[in-house]
Design a protein with these regions (language model features):
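ATP-dependent adenylation/nucleotidyltransferase module used to activate substrates
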Residues: 1-166, 177, 185-188
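AMP-forming adenylation/ATP pyrophosphatase catalytic core
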Residues: 133-376
C-alpha cells in the first residue's frame, strides 16, 4: 500500500492558502501547515506618524491566529517559523535601499525568491514534507519534450500572480504545488465555506504586508529614524529638472517619486508634468510631458529563465513591465550573463527601474529579470 504524500502548505491566514490546505486534506494527502513570521507589525508603531495600532494583514500576529484556527478545524499539524531577521535583511532593507536609490522595488518578488520558495522548502524537509503548496494563482507542469518544469498563467487571468514568481528555479518548481491554478476566486471562497473555515469571507490583502496602509513614504521615514539613518533628509534631496536640463524646483528626496508620477511634484506649470527619470548619481528628478514617458527598449539584469536554459538567439515574447500591465509584444535577446535587452513592437509607458520585466510565450512564463533602465 502506497503511503500518502506529505505536503507542507504555506498558510498566511488568508482565504487562498487556507483553501489549499482544505483541498489537499480532502484529497487524502498528509498536510502540515507552516506560517512564516516575517515582520513585527507593532515594531514601528508611533514612529514618524506611523499608526499606534496596526490591523492584521499578511504575516501579522492576527493572521497567524487565523491560520492556526484553520489548521485546528482541518485537524492538521501546524508550525510557525520565525524568519524576521532574514526577512529584514533580504526584503525590507533592499526595499528601503531601492527607494533611496530612486528605483521602485517589488518586495513580493524578493520575498518569493529569498523566503517563500527558498527557506520554506528547507523547513518543509525538516518537518518531513515531500513538497510545498501555496495559495498563488499560477500553474506548474512538467514538459517531457523540454525536460523542464514550466510556470504557467492560471485559468483566472484576473488573479494571475506569475509576475511575482519569475525567479523560481527548476528545483523549486519541481517541489511546488499551486492547487488554485485552475480555479476562480469565487470558487475558492465557496470551497472555504464548504469546509467551514472561519476565514471564508476574509478580505484579500491589497498592500505590501509590512507597510501599513500602503504608505511607503511614511514607512521609509519611520524605518530610517529607527535605524538612526538620516539619508531621507540629507543626501537624497536634490533638484527637479525638465528633460532639457532646466531647474524648476527642489525635492526632499528621490524616494518620494516613481516614474510616471504626476501628483505631488511640488511644482506649478502651465501643463501637466510627469516624472520621466530619476537620476541616482545626481539626485535629480527629471520631469516632462506624457509623451516623453514612452520607451521602446529596456535592459533587464539578474535574469532567470524558466522555459529554457539559455537564450541562444532573439526570441519573440510578450512582456509585462508591471503587475497590472497587459503583456506587450517584444523581442528579447541576450546582452551578457544574466542580462537581456527587450525591444517592444510599440513604445511602452513609464518603464520603471526596480520593477520586473517578465517574459511570456502564450501562458508560459519564459522568465524575467529586474528592469535596469530604458531608452526611447
Amino acid at each position: 500500500m502506497l503511503t500518502a504524500e506529505t505536503i507542507a502548505v504555506a498558510m498566511s491566514g488568508g482565504v487562498d492558502s487556507s483553501a489549499v490546505a482544505a483541498m489537499l486534506r480532502a484529497e487524502g494527502r498528509n498536510v502540515i501547515g507552516l506560517t512564516m513570521q516575517l515582520w513585527n507589525q507593532r515594531r514601528l508603531a508611533g514612529h514618524e506618524g506611523m499608526p499606534e495600532t496596526v490591523q492584521g494583514r499578511c504575516c501579522s500576529i492576527d493572521d497567524v491566529y487565523d491560520a492556526r484556527r484553520v489548521a485546528d478545524t482541518l485537524g492538521i499539524p501546524y508550525y510557525v517559523v520565525n524568519h524576521e531577521e532574514r526577512f529584514e535583511r533580504d526584503v525590507v532593507r533592499p526595499f528601503v535601499e531601492e527607494y533611496l536609490a530612486g528605483r521602485t522595488p517589488i518586495p513580493c518578488s524578493l520575498c518569493n525568491n529569498h523566503l517563500k520558495f527558498d527557506q520554506l522548502l528547507i523547513v518543509a524537509r525538516q518537518v518531513g514534507a515531500d513538497r510545498i503548496a501555496t495559495g498563488h494563482y499560477a500553474q506548474v507542469v512538467f514538459d517531457e519534450s523540454l525536460n523542464r518544469w514550466l510556470l504557467k498563467r492560471p485559468a483566472d487571468k484576473s488573479k494571475d500572480q506569475t509576475y511575482f514568481l519569475f525567479g523560481l528555479t527548476q528545483e523549486q518548481l519541481s517541489r511546488t504545488l499551486f492547487p488554485l491554478g485552475g480555479m476562480t476566486k469565487p470558487e475558492v471562497r465557496e470551497l472555504a465555506r464548504k469546509h467551514n473555515l472561519v476565514i471564508a469571507e476574509k478580505p484579500d490583502s491589497q498592500e505590501i504586508c509590512f507597510v501599513p496602509g500602503g504608505d511607503y513614504k511614511r514607512f521609509l521615514e519611520a524605518y530610517l529614524t529607527e535605524q538612526g539613518d538620516e539619508r531621507a533628509e540629507t543626501e537624497i534631496a536634490g533638484e527637479m529638472v525638465t528633460t532639457d536640463g532646466k531647474v524648476i524646483g527642489e525635492h526632499a528626496g528621490v524616494h518620494n517619486f516613481t516614474v510616471g508620477q504626476r501628483k505631488g511634484l511640488g511644482v506649478a506649470t502651465g501643463s501637466p508634468l510627469y516624472v520621466v527619470q530619476i537620476k541616482n548619481d545626481t539626485r535629480q528628478v527629471v520631469v516632462g510631458k506624457d509623451e516623453e514617458l514612452y520607451s521602446r527598449t529596456l535592459r533587464a539584469h539578474r535574469v532567470n529563465l524558466i522555459s529554457t536554459a539559455e537564450l541562444r538567439e532573439p526570441m519573440r515574447v510578450a512582456v509585462k513591465i508591471r503587475h497590472k500591465h497587459q503583456p506587450a509584444p517584444a523581442i528579447i535577446e541576450s546582452a551578457g550573463p544574466d542580462e537581456v535587452i527587450v525591444t517592444f513592437d510599440e513604445p511602452q509607458r513609464a518603464i520603471t527601474p526596480g520593477q520586473a520585466a517578465v517574459f511570456y510565450d502564450g501562458d508560459i512564463v519564459v522568465g524575467g529579470g529586474w528592469i535596469e533602465n530604458s531608452t526611447q
